[in-house]
């Protein structure tokens, strides 16, 4: 009989999000960047914990807007709508489809302060997917700040690590 269960943490990984630098604002928050795939078929982690940052433009911003990061699951045979499991620009077909296939990882309220870096941390993929974790998924980044993100690639990052239980005897 086990004495206790410890939580173990995998190695921190950085997602490929080429194209998020200079990402244009989209009023409907349907256009954005799909990340590279997070594939859990080999490691079998119980959860993934995400952190990240995005830097807005120096000017032209509108108050009371937002940056969104969504999780999108592979269904075992394919990707929904425009998603394909590769780091690429995507425009979701409609708000209704977005609401049906995307799960909110984080929504960051923004203001009109230029050159501000918006951080998020400790966001659980399992919680975003309402308690179930798909074998593969991508993240989708979109915003409606009224100005493109900073053009410097290093101003933006999404990283994660896997989490799994270890039974001690």
Identify what each model region corresponds to.
Residues 2, 61, 75-78, 86-94, ...:
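Exposed regions on extracellular, virion, or secretory-pathway luminal proteins
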Residues 40, 124-125, 141-144:
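Asparagine-centered strand-capping/turn motif at beta-strand->loop junctions
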Residues 65-91, 157-163:
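Extended low-complexity, serine/threonine- and proline-enriched intrinsically disordered segments
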